[in-house]
């Protein structure tokens, strides 16, 4: 796993950019970058409410550029999350997640556990569902209280 830096609050970056809602809706690249900073922040907040030690969130990229936005570890278990602004990109995220799962489980000597979950968090989506490959697709709004 390699370190990746995130804004503590992506609204700070939006303010520095002078990004109004109207401007962001016209600039999907910047909106996507801000969204990819928002989800890790919120996942860290959610995870902080769980008891126990060893709760952590990491970014993963290997030497072949397989990349997964978030690896969540809690209580000896792990899961992986890809972040996509649009639900239409959920398939891309699911492919990365399944590739990571295959990589982790392909070394029998390591005796790695299977992931507790694989999920794509999307900014624009109507409902949460599980794809045929077992990857959950979850709209960000569904994660709120």
What residue spans do the PLM features occupy?
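A cross-kingdom feature that marks ATP-driven nucleic-acid transaction machinery
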Residues: 1-145
